[in-house]
Amino acid sequence: MRTILNQWRIGLLALLAACSSPDQQTTTAPAAQDVRVRYTARRVALPGVPRRGRLLDRHDSVLVATRPEFLLKLPPRPPLDTLALGRLLGWDSTTVRRRFAEARPYAGAGSYPVQFRLTAAEVRRVRRDSAAWPTLALSQRPRRVYTTAAGAPVLGYWSEEAQPFLGQARRTSRGRFYRLRNGGVESYYNGLLAGHRGYAHPLEDAQGRPHGSWTRDTLFQEGQDLHLTIDAGLQSYAEKLLGGRKGYLVALDPRTGEILAYVSGPVFDPATLTAPDRAGLRAELLESDDRPLLNRPATLANPPGSVFKLVNAAVALQLGAIGPGTGFRCDQSLISCVHEHPVPRNLTVGLQYSCNPYFYQVMRNLIERVPDSLAADTVAARHANLAQWRRYVRSFGLDSVLGTDVPREAPGFLPTPAYYDKARQTRRWTYRSIYSLSIGQGEINLTGLQMANMAAIIANRGWYYPPHLVRGIGAGGPLPRFLHKHRTLIDSVHFAALLPGMKAVLERGGTAEASSLADVGITVAGKTGTVENGGDDDDDHAAFVGFAPADNPRIAVAVYLENAGFGATAAAPCAVLVMEKYLRGSIAPKRRNWERRIMSRARQGY
């Protein structure tokens, strides 16, 4: 019986060896081996631990790297003289209180093991007086070090170092949601960053004599560096514009889909989630009602408001429901219009003044027109027209994930005829019951990534590359799927018809004329949006999408600020400042006061 088992074992090992790579310099277990001999298949780790790859921005500035770090661990008992400890480390009393508050998960956590990260100068002080402080434990170990305080949702964390955060998150109901959605690039590309150790797979007999390998050896490989699409300077600048406010800002290069800036507000330092001495700050993030740990641009889908009029106009042009010269009365018996303006005699004027009644009638033309084949059945016509509208709108990458490299991307939502049949409890719903779609309200939900990508599609006249955060892996390029061009179902000529109206938005009389960059020679094309909040106490949400330069776009931006009021006064200024910063490298003097006022409000969180 044992002989039969040995024969079976040798045959299996021979088969595995035969499947090994032909360039592997190993010997196999031949069938001529003595079947009475028992062999042991081993897996032996080769010397060397792979270095984790670095994260670099688009200009090759290092954002995250693995470096030595010094930790000072305090004994839980007896309590130390904190003022004396502060003198030892060169800290004043305010710094001592702040560092202890940051290191403890909650006030009064006296027995919590406190650790402090130290600078080289502080380490020298501790070593010099170590005899007087025998209970202090100083250690050195390699850790991920962030060279920037910006980009938390982009950079994310290495889960091995984020265990304290993950442990704190498990103890809160909201934290269980956060811990799956904040890994960023460190989590998404972990396998490439980590590299892998080398392993040999020797086959030995009972006396330990080698008999080749039982499978292919694994080669040692260092972790690969990731070259991000992010512009670190632009990212830091954009975060100052949002600060403590709830919302997001996403900036893309429409020509490539590369994400230039990705802000989720309120902003926080990425090192907070992994630093051993910031348990208190992590607790504040987890418990905050403003939900700073929510990755808003990717995981939160909201009604887009009036910026969605651009999509509805493009679909209506494609399907022949309107033409560029189509005009409608500003009939406020249909829907209110918050802007006083001339009669929208064509699409350009309708976009310039964001006339709600104009786009109510555009969408009505789309939904209520009855094809000849359905002339006697308006119910069927509405169902067919809504389904057709949805098919064209979905080609913008909506109602589905874009396939970006941000963890847990949400798909957003577009209603179907079946959805309304169920919601209205009848198939005989009318356009009047779904007209909110015409102004980007109601059941439509888009993510920030989708909003920015929508602007990029219009900038490109109908095509896009999926938005992504990594432009190069090691010495290579991005993941192959980010090089695949996607096209909408809208002809390019119809996107060109939107451009005059989008330019007019930022010209005299337009809804965002104050945000014009004409003084520095930059023509911006954009669209403002004010999203109804639905609550009685809070302000509406502010939105803006646009791109610049209008005729040769190099940057597309989407901004969404919760409870900030009008898109023209809150969102548009942030967007154009980011455009100007990226295209010129500086802000014109006439907008410096404007910039300071926005940043001041951002620091105060409103």
What are these regions (language model features)?
Residues 2-15, 19-279, 301, 324, ...:
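Periplasmic/cell-envelope proteins involved in peptidoglycan metabolism and beta-lactam response
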Residues 64, 204-215, 255-307, 311-564, ...:
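Beta-lactam-recognizing serine transpeptidase/beta-lactamase-like catalytic domain environment
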